[in-house]
Swiss-Prot record:
Cysteine pairings via disulfide bonds: 15-32, 20-42, 22-47
Protein name: Conotoxin Cal9.2e
Proregion positions: 1-6
Organism: Californiconus californicus
Keyword match Ligase: no
């Protein structure tokens, strides 16, 4: 599992195009998932798309 450093979080979208970045409630690093996946485990119930990053 590849982690994303905090330094990169501010600048570079951490996921592949077409996917979204979910910040798990118990973690500071983002995980990437399909936009159609549930966001129940994501902070603020949000999975951030590349356009919204």
């Amino acid at each position: 599992k590849k982690g994303v450093t905090q330094r990169e979080d501010d600048r570079t979208f951490p996921c592949n195009s077409g996917r979204c970045a979910c910040q798990p409630l118990d973690s500071y690093s983002y995980t990437c998932q399909s936009p159609s996946s549930s966001t129940a485990n994501c902070k603020n119930n949000v999975c951030v798309s590349e356009a919204d990053w």
